[in-house]
Amino acid sequence: ANPICPKIPNPTIRISGRNDLCVDVK
């Protein structure tokens, strides 16, 4: 369970390890 990145309008998952990269989860 990765922390969700506060990004709008699409929910993104925060991946720790790569400068907290935010990936778009569709």
UniProtKB/Swiss-Prot annotation:
Glycosylated. High-mannose type oligosaccharides. GO terms for molecular function: toxin activity. Keywords: Apoptosis, Disulfide bond, Glycoprotein, Toxin. Lectin specific for galactose (Gal) and its derivatives. Induces apoptosis. Has cytotoxic activity against several human cancer cell lines. Is less cytotoxic to normal human cells. Disulfide-linked dimer of A and B chains. Cytotoxic activity repressed by addition of Gal and its derivatives. Melibiose preferentially protects normal cells from apoptosis as compared with transformed cells. The inhibitory concentration 50% (IC50) is 0.8 ng/ml for transformed cells and 10 ng/ml for normal cells. This is Aralin B chain. It comes from Aralia elata (Japanese angelica tree).
